Amino acid sequence: GTWEQYEAAGEWLDKLAAGIGCEIHRVQMVPGNHDLDRDKLSVGGSKLLEYIREGGAAEYEEVIANENDRSTLFSRFEDYGRFSVGYNCGLDDEAKYATNLRIEVGPGRWIRFVRLNSALLCHGREREEPAELMIGARQFTIPRPVAGEEIVVLVHHPLHWYKDAQEVRQYVDSRVRVFISGHEHDPKVQVNKFDDNCDVMMLAAGAAVPFKSDDTYTYTYNIIEFDWDESSDSLSVAIHPRTWNPAKTSFEADNKRLGGSEPQFILGSPNFRKAGLAAVDSGPKPSADTPDHVPEHVEFVPTEDAEVDTEETATMPSDVEGYELALLRFFRDLFESDRLRILLALDAIPAESNERMNQGMERKLFDWLVREGRLPEIIEMTDRLIAERNEGEM
């Protein structure tokens, strides 16, 4: 996970977003075992990982509770951190779960994305059996959903890779509607009934680039649709798996994996029902092809955690037009020197300040400028600095 690779990833994501009609900043991401820079693992960091592997939950919390030890492990995610914060998917630097986005799928019916980092303990030789990775209580205490809201968890490693899988599973079964993981290269889906009116989908999404290609492991990707099933007041999940056909040298529908020929699932969703009857528009529903198509309703929401400082929560900017794209370009497309140049020019950094500058501090200052109404100036300076760099490269 080096910056040159993330630059290429950003270009690929921009092309992917354009191909499916998605805004380039409307991306959710979580880190995997290839997203950390293993060359940055120090001798001390190796000892910390070994200490946790040989121990358990108590040893994990002992290390993570220490700011210096935590920083040692997170230092390997420096480039990923800069990349992901541009997409508003930055890592929680206290190793907690991250959640700041929810999307309306029906009248008063929402899905909230919760992101987990399962790669913090990765070192390049991690094993599935016996499991040695951990999610940790700071992350697996997933927020209890509110009425009208179902939770979709995004994480890289499947459950059985964790030493604390049993504890994680308790929270998944009681609070999550869809659990999406990657890492393993053979896609699978399973729906478990928690009770008569409550389902939990475990979706192992597979990998676009497997370590080998044969009848079992091949190049795959999925298109997943989330919708509201009005008749049952439930979350509807339609999975459209795609697989590589080497004979045709193209991707095609995959009728063997992830639901086969009937990839639509209606999941019992008690949190939808808690919201009461939905106010349904009885008129004809516009299609995506009609001019009056209504865009999706997306909300940025603060992490719901009793331990979050109210002052910290207040740093979230209001829904300012252009904020998301400006955030992406500021962190992903500018050098660190350019970002500091903007912050200094706009008086975001006090002249007498000697506080250490990191991505978290840069993000706070960026959001402060937005709240002060200075987003247009950020955008103008970002455009100018990128243009100057491009001219210099010609």
Language-model features: locations:
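Core catalytic region of metal-dependent phosphoesterases/phosphodiesterases
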Residues: 1-68
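Divalent metal-coordination and catalytic microenvironments
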Residues: 9, 32, 116, 153, ...
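Short, well-ordered amphipathic alpha-helices
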Residues: 9-17, 137-139, 224-226
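Conserved beta-sheet core of the metallophosphoesterase superfamily
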Residues: 159-237
